[in-house]
């Protein structure tokens, strides 16, 4: 059987009750917490930074998958690693050199995620798949929760799964 992991996003949580919301997810059986970090530059929204993640980390034993929707991402990787991220997920479009950013995350002993926007091509990561622990296929344009699903991403998922099975 597949090892399926449940990783709910806290983007739509009540930020004034974030500690309580995360505790409810932990008690509910989540395997990890997906933290969307937005800078108002790479995406048109602002969320949380390293100090909030560090504070949440003190009260949660679950892994944190920190999805960095910030640019330039490379200069902030270490701050999020130090704050308590277990997985750092980045976008190819947010770095000058994806492989360098991936290697920086690995050097910090964190797992690497790469996120592909609906319009991003799989070719951006094909040659780096052996260095990536997680691929996040965005089924909406990044920046806001509650958007309409973009069905065209299903073909991207099928293509990536086929590539994975051929390795």
What are the residue ranges of the model-derived segments?
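Short, intrinsically disordered, charge-balanced linker/junction segments flanking boundaries
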Residues: 163-167
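Short loop/edge segments at beta-strand edges and connector loops
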Residues: 116
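Short glycine-rich anion-binding loops that position phosphate/pyrophosphate groups of nucleotides
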Residues: 140-142
